[in-house]
Amino acid sequence: MIKIEKLTQSYCLNDINCTLPSGKLIGIMGANGAGKSTLLKTISGILPLKQGEIWFDNQPLSKMNSTEKSQHIAYLAQNTQIHWDLSVYDVIALGLATPLPKEKERSKIQTFSEKFAVTHLLDKPFQQLSGGEKARV
């Protein structure tokens, strides 16, 4: 579960409060400049918290070290300079917050791939995916 309390960040996020249940796929929608990316970057720990707190399973983000964060968070920006020659597996591995030992990496990527129904694509070159498949990855 992710719980956001009184999150204020920059000019675009003001007193955000919500609870996101575990195991659910959540969409964040809004106009350009509404703060979608700022919210995701703050949740993922890329941007430091200015005000408020984010909790992962009752553990505050502000108290987590990078290893603990990597157990809860992965972030891959939508528009990046993806290495087109990489497999889907490798692209997902790039999104991990910190490098993991190979066995833990495999396990985490397997879990993600099952959750987003892309397991059958793991060995496929990223450049060969359809638009919808790329979006899920």
PLM features per residue range, with description:
Residues 106-121:
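Conserved ABC ATPase "signature" region
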Residues 29-31:
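The feature captures the beta-strand-to-loop junction immediately N-terminal to the Walker
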Residues 4-7, 11-24, 52:
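Conserved beta-strand
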Residues 44:
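Helix-to-loop junction immediately C-terminal to a conserved catalytic motif
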Residues 125-129, 133:
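Conserved ABC ATPase signature
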